[in-house]
Amino acid sequence: MAVDNLQYEGEDLLLRLVLQPKSSRDQFIGLLGDELKIAITAPPVDGKANAHLIKFLSKQFKVAKGAIIIEKGLLSRHKRVRVCAPKKMPEFFNSLNE
């Protein structure tokens, strides 16, 4: 893909994200600058938003929760996340190419 926020390192996918916690539903929103914006329902308290983000991404990419690693931004809305060997690309990413 020609989107700046998607990079591959071997079989792993690296994503630069901006997170919107306390949303009404979990979803990919779109691009915000060079970051992918994701809305999740969990509040940004006691790591709940990070745990929920990992659960959401693991379902979207069809990988185990342990295959989602937040490399940077544990205490920030701006994150760098590694998806180890994603089994499936979410439908949302197809719309980024259009």
From Swiss-Prot:
GO terms for cellular component: cytoplasm. InterPro entries: DUF167, YggU-like_sf. Pfam families: DUF167. It comes from the Bacteria. PANTHER family: UPF0235 PROTEIN C15ORF40. Belongs to the UPF0235 family. This is UPF0235 protein Ping_3043. It comes from Psychromonas ingrahamii (strain DSM 17664 / CCUG 51855 / 37).
